[in-house]
Amino acid sequence: MPSIRAPLALTSFLLSLSGKPSTCVRSGLAANSRPWFGSIAGRNRVLANAPWWGGKAELSTDNSVVSGGKEENVDLKQYPPHLIRNFSIIAHVDHGKSTLADRLLELTGTIRKGHGQPQFLDKLQVERERGITVKAQTATMFYNYRSKKTGGANERFLLNLIDTPGHVDFSYEVSRSLAACQGVLLLVDAAQGVQAQTVANFYLAFESDLAIIPVINKIDQINADPEGVKSQLKQIFDIDPESVLLTSAKTGLGLENILPAVIERIPQPKGLVDASLRMLLLDSYYDEYRGVICHVAVVDGVLKRGDKIESAATRQSYEIMEVGILYPELTNTGILLTGQVGYVVTGMRSTKEARIGDTLFHTRSVVEPLPGFKPARHMVFAGVYPADGSDYEALSSAVERLTCNDASVSIAKETSGALGIGFRCGFLGLLHMDVFHQRLEQEHGAQVITTTPTVPYIFEYSDGSKLTIQNPAALPSNPKSRLVACYEPTVMATIITPSEYVGSLMTLCSERRGQQTEYSFIDGQRAMLKYRMPLREVVIDFYNELKSITSGYASFDYEEAPYQESDLVKLDILLNGQPVDALASICHRSKAHYVGRELCEKLKKVLDRQMFEVAIQAAIGAKVVARETLPALRKNVLAKCYGGDVSRKRKLLEKQKEGKKRMKRVGNVDIPQEAFHSLLKTGN
């Protein structure tokens, strides 16, 4: 009888069940490779022999050595405050923050090299598609370093890295991240140099009294000019060129100097180990299985699983069900000590309970709340409605789930005569609105219509009352009291541009009602302009115009400025004399005619023709400032006539004429959803 030879995979499987690691040499697998099957004991033995992160990655310099092994059991008690460094990476958009974060995680063995996912800390699909960071993310690393201060003794440091967004809309995420840090890496592109968001982020860190380590990235590029960038940093921020680090996150060049600089230049956390517990709540998101997961920074004291804690803002009490670090995924450690950053699970069922910037402390202890930080101020408002008017419940569910993970969006229910029931949402900026819309569609499958973005205005009346308007339809066209003054929000805009585009940009800013406050040259090729501008002029399409004029070379950033008095009017769009609330807008009187003409022309293109003539008008109160006429469809009522008396034809035509008059008098114009889609598309 011929012998039957068991397949190699089956042999490996049986060996693993017996608790012996499989060699699998003939199958092409390494002797200590990790099989996906087998008993727990066998799997543990295999893991002990060959760590999944790819073995040790020893990288040494004169005074430091990086340990390449990912710790199986993390004991946070081994890391007192003097062995902890909390730092963040801040930079302009696309200057390489997330790529540098990847290299540092690989360097310390936190993730394996070539993990198959570039920008590891960019978790959201929208972040990967757009190549931007939207949510700040935290990761803990461990690093062996021989410090001169300890006489060359090798010490293991705990480093908390926070990767922050670079876009102006998400500067709130940056400010939250900096609250948990003692220092930052200020990253600058070696080719592009200092940009607008570089300036804004530097002053955020400077005002927070953080240690700043300047790093010039992308020095491997052909057009890199590190010396030129050093001189820019010296001129704008008075940074010593000798303190600047040079690196390429893409190739790893100069990377070994960054973490030693973090340890040497950034101070340890200042908290007190023996004091009562105080934690700063940095961020929160909703998990379907564990409820709300909070990211926290322990300022004073110690937090352990089973502790009872209380919120300083809501005075609600919770029990710590799970506590740990992000290594880089959630890793349960059972404890967090002074100066450490991690996560807690408390059984909260809604992110509304987790107020960002709140102080958490042990129940029945008396502590002084931490300063926290200002709540996010919403700069742009827009209506969000279901594409299918009857699908409100599905939209409501999607919005509720998404806002669980994005607490910076404000939500209020509203009703529109044209679009049905929806929500009035407040956003940090246009990109934030775009990202919210995209996440609704991608993550929750909701098809929505987003109305034209508006900004919050203040209207003052003769009786002394003040009305803040976020939705133009809510402003009465004929108020009972006389309007005394109107105020609109403004921003302080910073533009950094090649000097040949300065004239064109000055013209653009003047057309947008901007007032110049500063004009200076950074070097021989680039200038910095500062303007105070109305926020409405910025949120419509200013950024696109700026990029178009400068061929994409200019960078733009803005920060909040006080309200200013302005000559504002409400512009209504009428169809056959009936106002369409979803198309109402508030604009400056000098631009009302232009805006009204543009809207009327667009409506004429997207509306279906009716059996009667449709008048499309733009009006300020009772005064019509623009008009377009949509001609009626003509039905051939004479088709059934084959000659004969002309009076018969005349009678049919007169009857049709009377019918059209009657239809025009009582007929309503239905605006199809497709028309709203094309008309209200952002940027139109």
Swiss-Prot record:
Catalytic activity as recorded in UniProt? GTP + H2O = GDP + phosphate + H(+)
Determine if Membrane is one of this entry's keywords: yes
UniProt entry keywords in alphabetical sequence: GTP-binding, Hydrolase, Membrane, Mitochondrion, Mitochondrion inner membrane, Nucleotide-binding, Protein biosynthesis
Annotated localization: Mitochondrion inner membrane
Cystine bridges: which residues?
A: none
In terms of InterPro entries, this protein maps to:
EF-4 (IPR006297), EFG_III/V (IPR035647), EFG_V-like (IPR000640), EFTu-like_2 (IPR004161), G_TR_CS (IPR031157), LepA_C_sf (IPR038363), LepA_CTD (IPR013842), LepA_IV (IPR035654)
Supply one GO CC term from the record.
Answer: mitochondrial matrix
**Membrane topology of this protein:** Peripheral membrane protein
Give any single GO term for biological process.
translation
Q: What is its EC number?
A: 3.6.5.-
Nucleotide-binding recorded as keyword: yes
GO molecular-function term, one example from the UniProt record: GTP binding
Q: Which residues bind GTP?
A: 91-98, 163-167, 217-220
Ranges that cross the membrane:
none
CDD domains on file: EF4_II, EF4_III, LepA, lepA_C
Q: What class of enzyme is it?
A: hydrolase
Q: Which PROSITE patterns match?
A: G_TR_1, G_TR_2
Q: Where is the tr-type G domain?
A: 82-270
Q: What else is known?
A: This protein may be expected to contain an N-terminal transit peptide but none has been predicted.
Say what the protein does: Promotes mitochondrial protein synthesis. May act as a fidelity factor of the translation reaction, by catalyzing a one-codon backward translocation of tRNAs on improperly translocated ribosomes. Binds to mitochondrial ribosomes in a GTP-dependent manner.
UniProt family annotation: Belongs to the TRAFAC class translation factor GTPase superfamily. Classic translation factor GTPase family. LepA subfamily.
Name this polypeptide is given? Translation factor GUF1 homolog, mitochondrial
Q: Give the species.
A: Physcomitrium patens
